[in-house]
Amino acid sequence: MLPIVPLPQKQKRKNSKTNIASLNQPFILSQTEIDKSKSSIFKINIAVKNTSNNNTNKINNKKVSKKNEKTEIKNNNNNNLTFIENAIINFEKGFYNQSLQQALKSIEIEDSEEKANYIAFLCYLEMYDIDSAEKFLCNNNNNKKLKNLLENKKLQILLNSNKYKSYPKYINFLQNLHKNNSYFPKLEIHFYTDDYRGVLAKNKILKDEIIMAIPKQCLITLEVALNTNYGKKISEFMHQELNSPKHCLLSSFLLFEENNPIYKYYFDLLPNDYSNFPIFYTKKEFDYLKNSPFLNLIMNKKLDMQMDYNKLCEKIENFKNFTFEKFCKARLIISSRIFGISINNNKTDALVPFADLLNHRRPRQTQWFFDDDKNAFIVQAVEDINIGQEIFDSYGKKTNYRFLLNYGFTLENNDMGEYPLTINFNNEYPLYNMKKNFFKNKYDFIRTFNLNSNFQESQILELISYLRFLLYEENINNLFKKILSNRKTLNEEIAINYYFFYPINIEMEIKVLSHLKYLCEKELEKYPTTILQDQKLYKENKNKKDFNFNYRNCLLLLISEKSVLIYYIQFCDYCLQLLKSKKITEVIDKVAKDYKENNFKYNFYIKEVILKLVYEKEKEEIENDKKNYEKKQKTKEDKDMDEEDDI
């Protein structure tokens, strides 16, 4: 699992129990918070006493004007606290940049300089500004505790970055976020390996607590990209001529602004290796997916990117300076990282530094939204998170197809499966010459249906309806009359273009399900390995350090594909068995028993199709039995009358 990527939709905002300051204004405390802050101020007083040099002497010859100034000047707040008191409180709250400014002001007016130096020193450490922290250490040259704090922070940074060359980019990234008044006091970036990182909790986090706030000025939104010369040019044709207009716009921004000092701190931290994304697979890695329909998705995605790239080269000056490979990487950054948000009721997409470092996990630990009042992107905990625990986002409920194609990883226990089943309408189907006239063009002769392990009602109904059309052997016009008779409840376009054919009879439905089972079995036969062989391979290798990451992803994808096909084969077998029931009570009894044991997901098909067909069949047989009985009775009566006449 690789880091970074957002939820596909905006999360529902909840009321926060944690109050944080406006990110563009000084932190104003309530009277309750002021009272609570006394303990924090006391702790800082003790810390300063314990860490101060015993030989340090106070300057006794301060000017009277300075002395008066320090007692009269407050922090432009209504809480009647001095600069140093506000600095301490803001430090405790995690607003290090604001705390630093107040500490520096306190030093400037020579008020509580020892405390102010100590607070400033700690602020620089928290903001990873080691050089400035060392300067403040010089003011306390004999202070061993401060030296130890500094060395520990340096060591923490080096250990956390895992390799020295990552250190400058990592530090610069955090420094810039702090300078822009970003808020994440309880979070730290952790590197598990050279290429895999996550976000950990430095302190205990409570449910509903705001754990991150990234100001709007740090976000790269569609509006930011549109405000450039090339962005304005792209906007003239993006929706008409590009396959992925928004992604292309933001990708262009990444390419053109690569060396822009405003964003360089963020761009420098973006990954350079994209070999885990399928569009960059080697021939050997493509062979892992032999006969998988996923190969077609990769080709189509790359083709769409190529078309967009060609169009941008044609329309945008100097775009040819960027290679197609570089454009693809920029597109992958966007597709795997953007957040869909709403700012002042305007929907937009945005890159959000730091927030995009959260890895994926379901169920979610956090929710995110843009807060118009705070003018910032907010991440909020939806459960308690312990110290040292990794903090996750949820990228949404997606299949491994979507995860691998757009994010470069798969999930081992993903209950969402997908298989694109392609059906080629040809002369092997009955009444081919008559039926082909109903297709708009030759492309309609080949249709693909996404089989889903969640068994979505609309998808399976569309597939089975289409098969009813293909397998129908009587006068096709009668079938369309049946469709058109339902137009009161059925959109005409859906009826004609999507072949929404209602169940005809049990015999026809048996044909349809038998054919669907046959199609799924044929797809399974294409693979060089069985699902049992794939599962065995994965189980034997998943804990090995040298288990190739891309091979792992391909194995999990193949297992997922085959699982879906097997699931639909089992569905067909089960429903065929039900359709052979003679009485509706037999169906109800069996389904009630099996539902408790299996809790299968295709209840709606049983209810809407099978029960109705079996009921109609049973009713028809009862009517036939009644007619036969009446016929026999009449025959008997006629015979009796004939005998009476003979007598």
Question: Over which residues does each language-model region extend?
Answer:
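Long, positively charged leader/targeting segments at protein N-termini
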Residues: 162-218, 223-226, 257-632, 638-647
